[in-house]
């Protein structure tokens, strides 16, 4: 703790976070909460994700960092899928940071670990994810802080959650 969990999928990108990252402006009794970004999926929400990316002032700098151009948005390649997943990570982090006032603002400098699960773990490497997170922290938060990146490629988190739910029934 504190942690955030990102589930980047085809239709949505979900973020689960520990409540110790939330400013006092949110009332919650749970130890954690979540947000679902319906328009930041990589397959079913592809066009919405691209639109959101094109409207972020830092995305073209990020694309340059990734050594691609905006033409990647129109490609149907494995490389394009990787870039879209990286953009989904970046855009969600922007939405939950002080950069964007549209959603809650999490204390991202206090995050010790970022766990990634979902389809993203089958497409991106740890290094590719860490590169995006480092870009976000440096560019948006002006910080050298680097949370530990953990890939849940076997969906262990969901298995544990399902088992605990059965015990409660």
Q: What is the predicted function of each stretch?
A:
Residues 1-6, 13-169:
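Helical "lid/coupling" subdomains associated with nucleotide-phosphate turnover
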